[in-house]
From Swiss-Prot:
This protein's name: Glycerol-3-phosphate acyltransferase, chloroplastic
Signal sequence bounds: none
Catalytic activity: sn-glycerol 3-phosphate + an acyl-CoA = a 1-acyl-sn-glycero-3-phosphate + CoA
Pathway annotation from the record: Phospholipid metabolism; CDP-diacylglycerol biosynthesis; CDP-diacylglycerol from sn-glycerol 3-phosphate: step 1/3
One Gene Ontology cellular component: chloroplast stroma
Domain commentary: The HXXXXD motif is essential for acyltransferase activity and may constitute the binding site for the phosphate moiety of the glycerol-3-phosphate.
Keyword annotations from UniProtKB, A to Z: Acyltransferase, Chloroplast, Lipid biosynthesis, Lipid metabolism, Phospholipid biosynthesis, Phospholipid metabolism, Plastid, Transferase, Transit peptide
């Protein structure tokens, strides 16, 4: 599971919501810290340096858990203090190795044959002092909710699927409790000796109702993959709905575009690499880790240290883009979509124009051809977020079996929008709004297909739905 948070400026305004959408309330956006960084020009760019205000990342290590009387929650302030202390205590690489040698650890969960044995094992490991009681409570809740969702699918092998997937998940969670994994600003998916990517795919797959799931504009995904193979960079400007977004995106594309599914890099918030129930799933994804400004001042005396540490992630992203052939997913709303509290309707949260513009400028100065595409994702029922953004790490995970949707829109030309406007701020806002409008339109088509039961007939002129797995 993943908590993915996007880059967001602390001062810029958001794109307006299209008039075609009903009014709705937005949860507070998650904004990130910015540092001014000058980057030397690439060989193919001009001699002037690129200066950006862009959110950057710390080198993260998992914070220690607080009182077991709280349910899988710990102080964000304490967590960050320990994180900074760990970072300053040792030099670590900016990019995580793509392998992780499993250290000796309890493998108690792997040989279980029933629900009774699984629950008993959680209690036994807790009594032995190997599991904090709050993590154990989280494991039990995750098991029950996952079991209910898989059984909801009607799969005749639900018993086998639940036990197989949950024993592996609990084994990986316990391993990380015993030997916490440390994420670097640029984390590469760990595929061996244990394949964390395949583990995440297998875990989320039973939650997707593929008969009621759709992909929009499959031909554009093919175009994107061709551009990547030609050395171009591509950034997908997307909405963000659940912790499981990366797995859902990959599962919807694994039949037709496995290269995209496996090589996408996600801009990820600090929660994705701190929550003990999320970390094993995050280890299997390519990440650029960022820290939300919302928590920057939790411990004021550490704020400057964090900002200085953040410069490493900007440099990592810039270097990646200069090498070409990079595919980066980012949600410039600053967090997961939330429903309108008065109607319960879900819509993509507005984009932060500065975040969009920063990504555009990074592409422009990379020295390789770059493209921004609007991407829409509908999957909130699989694992909806809390109704409000929470400060504490750890959240109740409601899980269900449901249809999902993914659609990409045509690339939107910045130059065409800039040609009709003189004010740079107006250009920036107009470009961000154009991307958002495309995402909102695609989202409405997916919503009509899935929630409205229109299926493939929901397709419109510029959003062609398909089900390539059928």
């Amino acid at each position: 599971m993943f908590i993915l948070s996007a880059v967001s400026s602390s001062s810029s305004s958001s794109s307006s919501v299209p008039s075609s959408l009903p009014p709705f309330s937005l949860s507070p956006s998650i904004s990130l810290s910015f540092s001014r960084v000058s980057l030397p020009p690439s060989s193919s760019s001009s001699s002037s340096s690129l200066k950006l205000f862009l959110p950057l990342s710390l080198h993260f290590t998992p914070p220690k858990l607080s009182s077991p009387h709280s349910f899988l929650r710990f102080s964000a302030s304490r967590a960050m203090a320990e994180l900074i202390q760990d970072k300053e205590s040792a030099h670590t690489p900016s990019t995580t190795d793509v392998t992780r040698n499993d250290p000796p650890h309890s493998r108690a969960f792997l040989d279980l044959r029933s629900e009774e044995e699984l629950l008993s094992c959680i209690r036994r490991e807790t009594e032995a002092g190997k599991l904090p009681s709050n993590v154990a409570a989280g494991m039990e809740e995750l098991y029950q909710n996952y079991k209910n969702a898989v059984f909801e699918s009607g799969n005749p092998k639900a018993d086998e699927i639940v036990l197989s997937n949950m024993t592996v998940a609990l084994d990986r969670i316990l391993l990380d409790v015993e030997d916490p994994f440390m994420f670097s600003p640029h984390h590469k998916a760990i595929r061996e000796p244990f394949d964390y990517y395949t583990f995440g795919q297998n875990y989320v797959r039973p939650l997707i109702d593929f008969e009621n799931s759709f992909v929009g504009n499959l031909s554009l995904f093919k175009d994107i993959e061709e551009k990547l193979h030609q050395g171009h960079n591509v950034v997908l400007i997307s909405n963000h709905q659940t912790e499981a977004d990366p797995a859902i995106i990959s599962l919807l594309l694994e039949k037709t575009n496995p290269y995209i599914a496996e090589n996408m890099i996600y801009v990820a918030g600090d929660r994705v690499i701190a929550d003990p129930l999320c970390k094993p799933f995050s280890i299997g994804r390519n990440l650029i880790c960022v820290y939300s400004k919302k928590h920057m001042l939790d411990i004021p005396e550490l704020a400057e240290t964090k900002r200085k540490a953040n410069t490493r992630s900007l440099k990592e992203m810039a270097l990646l883009l200069r090498g070409g052939s990079q595919l980066i997913w980012i949600a410039p709303s600053g967090g997961r979509d939330r429903p309108d509290p008065s109607t319960g309707e879900w819509y993509p949260a507005p984009f932060d124009a500065s975040s969009v513009d920063n990504m555009r400028r990074l592409l422009q100065h990379s020295g390789a051809p770059g493209h921004l595409y609007p991407l829409a994702l509908l999957c909130y029922d699989i694992m909806p977020p809390p109704s409000q953004v929470e400060i504490e790490i750890g959240e109740k995970r409601v899980i269900s079996f449901n249809g999902t949707g993914l659609s990409v829109g045509p690339e939107i030309s910045f130059d065409e929008i800039a040609a009709s406007r003189d004010n740079p701020d107006e250009v920036r806002e107009a470009y961000s709004k154009a991307l958002y409008d495309s995402v909102a339109k695609q989202y409405n088509v997916l919503k009509a297909a899935i929630d409205g039961k229109q299926e493939l007939e929901a397709s419109v002129a510029d959003v062609s739905l398909s089900q390539p797995w059928i």
